[in-house]
Every structure is written in C-alpha cells, then in structure tokens.
Amino acid sequence: MNKLVHIIGAGLAGSEAAWQLVKNGFNVVIHEMKRVKKSPVHVSENFAELVCSNSLKSTDLKNAEGLLKAEMEIWGSLILECAYNNSVPAGKALAVDREKFSQCVTEKLLQTGLVKVVWEEVEKPYTDDIWIIATGPTTDGKLAEWIREQTGGFFNFFDAVAPIVSAESINMDVCFVADRYGVGTGDYINCPMTKEEYERFWNELVNAQVIEIEDFDRKLLFERCQPIEEIARSGKDAMRYGPLRPVGIVDPKTGKEPYAVIQLRKENVEGTMYNIVGFQTRLKWGEQRRIIQLIPGLENAEILRYGVMHRNSYIDSPKVLDEYLRLKKMPNVFFAGQITGVEGYVESAMTGLYVGLNISRLILGKDMIKFPEKTMCGALVRYITTAPELKPMYANFGLLGGGKDREKIALKALDEMKKFYQITSLTIGG
C-alpha cells in the first residue's frame, strides 16, 4: 500500500493525525487553504489555530475532559504536548498562549522532514492515496459540495467567539484577582457588579444590535458557545446562574460575593491580553465596545479582538462512516475533527489521533483498532459512529454509563487504556 497520506486541513484533528503518521515514519501531505483563502474564524497561517477560546478545559481526572486528556497522553498526543508546554495559568483548566501553541504544533510537524504543505483549496480527494478530511466545522465551497454528494448532506449548528481586551486597559482599582473557591494561583481577573450595574448591563445587552447571519436559528445554537446576548434573553437572572455567576468569588473590598461577576482569563503567557470568559457574542462591533465598557473595570477597555459567530457543519457519521471513521462508500477516505460530530478542541484532536493510528496500522498491513468502549476516547468514537440521532458531543461521564464515583471510573478507564496501548502500540519509526 502507498505510504503517502493526504490530509485536508491543518487544524487540531489534521495536525494530530499527521503527528501519529510521521511518528511511524510515513510521509504526509497537508493541504491547507489559509494562505489562499481564510475562513471567517482564522487569522494566522499556523497549524492548530484555536478559535473559540484559549482554554482546553479541565485537567482534573474527575472531570471528563481531564480523563480524555490523560488517555490521549498515553498515545503521545502532539496537541497536548504543545498545550502543556505553552500553557498560561487558569486554575484547573488547561489554557494556552494561542500563538505559541500553534507555532509549536507547526514547528514540530515541519521539523520531522516528513510533512509537505501544499497551500491550496482542495475541491475533492484527487488521487488513489489515503485521504483524511479534517477541514473542521466551517467547511464550505466545492469540497463541501463534494462531501454533501458523498454523505447526503450536513447538519448545522452555530457557535461564537469571545472578545479579547488588553491587560493595560483593565482598571485594577475596580477589578480584583481571585479564583473561584480560592482554588488556583490567582489566574482570573474579576469585574464585580452590583445589582444596579447588573440590571443596567442586562437591559442594554438584550436591546443591543446583532450582526444578522444567514439562516440563523436559535434552536441551532450549541450549548457551550451560546452568545451572551442569547443567554441574557432567556431570563433576567440567566447570566447570574451562568457565566456571570458570583458563587465562590469574594470581593476583597467588601468581603462578600458580588451580585454578579465577569471573569477575565489570560490569553497569552505574558499576560498582556485577557479574554472575557463566557462572553461569546454576535453583537455588532460598535455595540460590543459599548456593552463591554459598561462592565465595571472595563470602562476604557481596549478591544484587541471582537467576538464573532459562525455556522458549524457536521456529517451524519453513524450513517456514512464505519467504526474507524472511514467513509463506507470510499474506503481510502477518512474523516476527523468536528466535522464528524464531536465538539471541543481536545475531542477534535482525539479523532485525529485515532485516525492517524489506524491509518498507520492499515499501511503496515495490520488490523485497525478500536479504543476500548469503557475509555473516554472509545466511548466518544462509539457515540459518533452509532448514535441513532447524532448531536454534537463533547466528553462526559454519561458516555461511560452510570456510577457516581467519577474518580474510580476515570482510574479504571485510564488503566484499561494503558493496557490496550501496551498490547497494540506500534514501535516503528523511532
């Protein structure tokens, strides 16, 4: 079998798949369009660009996201290696310096000498080699048309991106540094609100002008990236029980919890940029500036990046992909990333890892493998390939069945993955 593998898209899934292949000595051609045409959400030419947030979520094993990471580390995940090496303080969450993280992934892959980058917009797989389609949820153009022909169409949902402000424009006479419940190393800046300030903020937010998006449907909003204005419209106190909840945060000036609080998290290692946590939005840019400057401590905020919203698409994986994320009607084509129906940075990378591992085995004439179903990786892959009605899914303990002792479940899953790795891991290429 030809040892050359083509990957369309150098996002988290495509980059992770490439890493698993080059680790085993195989040549990879990455087809990336960003130098020719950028999607609405990308800004640089580096691989593995983070869009929605700079947080890869929890590292705690009692959290499903933490378990997912721990399992992937067993297989030598490039995404996690670069994430940990370029992390910024964020309590129990793994947050990264976006630019340095993407640069790390790019350099690691190119330094192998086995990766060739072709800057082009691919319309469809055009050789008989193995192809991985990892173009992400904003796939469009001729390639989207080709995928639609092969799969019967796309499902859609919408998500959004939060704004970033400059650190020097934050008024620390008003804001204060604290972590929820005192857990962490002072990783968040908090903007406290009184009841009057909150109510004014809410009133202005629900009446602010938004950017009209073609075919926008509130029913298609993804839960974890709900625009702040949509949360606000669902009820006057909805934000106080969501991203603006004050529970566990004490204002040192009053010794009490504020009525509401907006948190800011470091965006880069130097701490010169902060993103507004949970403030994904589709407000018009002028309105964003006006609303953000209503937040106590951000009266003179310099906005370095405005929030945006975009449509995400994914295929009907249970219908069109096999258990290895391979197109049933075209066995030389695999899919990876959010286009398969997973949701989240790390989940996306995991599918790339899975596909990269299995293509390595396929080229070597070995049987492909399925992660054990009682691992988080295995449960996620099983869900997206068997769900009766596929909805975007992120790591959660519900996928592993019942049981209240999450730590016990996680340790058992981790032990199972370690044993599976010892039995099935490849030792070629190094």
From Swiss-Prot:
Co-factor(s): FAD
Record's keyword annotation contains Flavoprotein: yes
Protein name, UniProt field: Methylenetetrahydrofolate--tRNA-(uracil-5-)-methyltransferase TrmFO
Function as written in the Swiss-Prot or TrEMBL entry: Catalyzes the folate-dependent formation of 5-methyl-uridine at position 54 (M-5-U54) in all tRNAs.
Gene Ontology biological process: tRNA methylation; tRNA wobble uridine modification
Reactions it catalyzes: uridine(54) in tRNA + (6R)-5,10-methylene-5,6,7,8-tetrahydrofolate + NADH + H(+) = 5-methyluridine(54) in tRNA + (6S)-5,6,7,8-tetrahydrofolate + NAD(+); uridine(54) in tRNA + (6R)-5,10-methylene-5,6,7,8-tetrahydrofolate + NADPH + H(+) = 5-methyluridine(54) in tRNA + (6S)-5,6,7,8-tetrahydrofolate + NADP(+)
MF terms in GO: flavin adenine dinucleotide binding; tRNA (uracil(54)-C5)-methyltransferase activity, 5,10-methylenetetrahydrofolate-dependent
Major subcellular site: cytoplasm
Subcellular location as annotated: Cytoplasm
Gene: trmFO
Annotated organism of origin: Fervidobacterium nodosum (strain ATCC 35602 / DSM 5306 / Rt17-B1)
The keyword Acetylation appears for this protein: no
Sorted UniProt keywords: Cytoplasm, FAD, Flavoprotein, Methyltransferase, NAD, NADP, Transferase, tRNA processing
Residues reported to bind FAD: G9, A10, G11, L12, A13, G14
A GO CC term attached to the entry: cytosol
EC number, as in UniProt: 2.1.1.74
UniProt-listed SUPFAM superfamilies: FAD/NAD(P)-binding domain
PANTHER family to which the protein is assigned, alphabetical: GLUCOSE INHIBITED DIVISION PROTEIN A (PTHR11806), METHYLENETETRAHYDROFOLATE--TRNA-(URACIL-5-)-METHYLTRANSFERASE TRMFO (PTHR11806:SF2)
